[in-house]
Amino acid sequence: MRTTDMADELFRGPETELPAGVRLATAKRGGVTVTRVEIAREGLARPRGRYVTLEMPSVSVLDERDTDVIETGAAELRALLPPEGPVLVLGIGNRRVTADALGPRTAQKLLVTMGPQHTLPVRGIRPVAALAPGVSGDTGLTLRQLAAAMVDAVRPAALICVDSLCSAEAARLGRTIQFSDTGLHPADARHARHLDAAALGVPVIAAGIPTLMDADEGADLVLTPRALDSVIAHGSALLAGILNRALQPRLSVAQLCWLTG
């Protein structure tokens, strides 16, 4: 089987055929299919924890104004987050490589509420900081070193890592969003992007959209969606809209668009 970061691609079929310790449930919300996978034990294809996948029409035709998708995604993401406390968002990836630019592009669109310009607390506004740490070739530091330094500086209640994901199915590229509370654990062992609570001492939520797939098992070749530029542009806007709504539930989608536009 080709490499995949998507938990629902690994565990499918009737409940009686699922491995022991795995639960799967699917529901429709408007035009969005929500699949929840809960892995209750170690030793399976993905780390123990909760995974939520939203499946929809291509994100290349959606953006931060698509209220139904944003409300559905925000509710699912909010359920994985601590109810209060500062949140640090890291946009993982290389902004110069289109298929890997989802994280940095998403971080640019977030409503940041920490820093010198936000010295006075506003009732109901959650403190949020965002950063695109770049790649080790540019910084000379590993992702884990940078993440640990940022966590030490911000002292967040949770860390959200946004990254491009890998799917095993071409039809799902640019059409799904996955959230998980397991941290960042790329299925491809060649990627050194592993961040989790054990390494950083805070809950780590992973969020992403699949933008590539292996062309063949064991080959150094990947496939990307035909409209990749549009997938990254619209997908990052949609994902930022979901994160903003999840982190600032007292602000409407329209208000968040105005504040970040």
Residue ranges and their predicted role:
Residues M1-G49:
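N-terminal amphipathic/basic leader segments beginning at the initiator methionine
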Residues R41-L81:
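An N-terminal, well-structured beta->alpha segment
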Residues E55-P57, P86-V97, A130-G134:
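Short glycine-rich or small-residue beta-strand-to-loop segments that form or flank ligand, phosphate
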Residues T72, E76, T98-G115, T176-H185:
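A glycine- and small-aliphatic-rich helix-loop capping segment at beta-alpha/alpha-beta transitions
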Residues I92-L102, G137, S164-A168:
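Gly/Ser/Thr-rich loops at beta-strand to alpha-helix junctions
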Residues R105-T139:
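Long, charge-dense
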Residues V128-L159, S164:
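Catalytic-core regions of hydrolytic enzymes
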Residues L131-A132, Q145, C161-G261:
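A structural signal for small-residue-enriched, beta-sheet-centric alpha/beta enzyme cores
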